[in-house]
């Protein structure tokens, strides 16, 4: 299966090893940020609504409607398929030759890790999970949360290391270099996963998070981005959209926000 591509978007999180992207159905492209600039990778075939995308800096990885993962460089190649019938891939992240995938089912989730070097797929199912709300590979481990208020930490073999109840509807998460994890909630609270300390920082819901060095950037349901220090003291805020921010990505000193309509707007980090 080969399709010519023309480069004419790359979303990157706060850490160089964690690259991201998303699918824009309206113009049939992969959207990403590179060197602080918004870019497009135009695909010469149909993109279906709500497809997921991952990126490791060399290739993009797209999930199709059959839960197959396709590697996209200058052509498209089949890599692997999740074995569960009836699940919906909701997360893809690619780091260090490994592709991490979450596939949602009714009150259950299937997690897969594909090692490109070994051409090997490892999958395990976890029950009593109602849809993945955040998904963070951490070194060789994997952290994820579900909308029904649970957080899971898995080892490199996908064995459960830790499971916590963290409160209703964690919507977003980010991590610092030392792997401290913060969770953002619908009610405007922030939770430090390691200490268990919660703090109310917004009156509106926290829909997106990005951690960078000693700073935290929060996107809310009204389209505003807030800048906090690591002690959760407010350092500034900027209106970016008129509706909910679903993702925040940072690259080269530029913050890029994505709203529910897949619009992208940028802010200089030092403008707060």
Segment roles from a protein language model:
Residues 3-14:
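Sec-dependent N-terminal signal peptides
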Residues 18-27, 47-57, 86-94, 129-137, ...:
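Repeated scaffold domains used in trafficking and secretory/extracellular systems
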Residues 20, 39-48, 77-83, 119-126, ...:
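A short beta-strand motif characteristic of beta-propeller blades
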Residues 20-23, 29-33, 59-64, 98-103, ...:
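Short beta-strand elements that form the blades of beta-propeller/WD-repeat-like
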Residues 28, 36-37, 65-69, 106-109, ...:
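Loop/turn residues immediately N-terminal
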Residues 36, 73-76, 115-119, 155-159, ...:
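Short loop/turn segments that connect beta-strands within beta-propeller blades
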Residues 150-152, 159-221:
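Eukaryotic tandem repeat interaction scaffolds
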Residues 245-272:
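Blade-level signature of beta-propeller repeat domains, shared across WD40, Kelch, NHL, RCC1
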């Amino acid at each position: 299966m080969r399709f010519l591509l023309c480069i004419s978007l790359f979303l990157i999180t706060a850490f160089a090893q964690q690259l991201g992207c998303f699918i824009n159905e309206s113009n049939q492209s992969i959207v990403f940020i590179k060197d602080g600039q918004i870019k497009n990778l135009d695909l010469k075939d149909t993109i279906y609504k709500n497809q997921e995308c991952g990126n490791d800096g060399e290739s993009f990885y797209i999930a199709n409607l059959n839960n197959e993962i396709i590697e996209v460089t200058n052509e498209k190649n089949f890599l692997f398929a999740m074995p569960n019938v009836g699940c919906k891939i909701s997360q893809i992240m690619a780091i260090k030759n490994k592709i991490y995938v979450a596939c949602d089912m009714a009150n259950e989730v299937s997690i897969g890790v594909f090692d490109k070097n070994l051409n090997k797929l490892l999958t395990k199912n976890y029950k009593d999970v109602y849809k993945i709300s955040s998904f963070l590979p951490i070194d060789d481990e994997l952290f994820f949360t579900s909308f029904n208020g649970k957080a899971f930490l898995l080892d490199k073999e996908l064995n459960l290391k830790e499971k916590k109840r963290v409160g209703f509807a964690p919507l977003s998460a980010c991590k610092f270099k030392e792997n401290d994890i913060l969770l953002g909630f619908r009610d405007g609270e922030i939770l430090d996963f390691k200490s268990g300390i919660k703090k109310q920082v917004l009156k509106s819901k926290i829909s997106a998070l990005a951690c960078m060095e000693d700073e935290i950037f929060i996107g809310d349901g009204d389209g505003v981005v807030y800048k906090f220090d690591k002690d959760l003291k407010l350092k500034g805020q900027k209106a970016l959209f008129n509706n909910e921010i679903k993702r925040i990505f940072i690259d080269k000193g530029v913050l890029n926000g994505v709203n529910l309509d897949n619009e992208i707007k940028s802010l200089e980090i030092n403008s707060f």
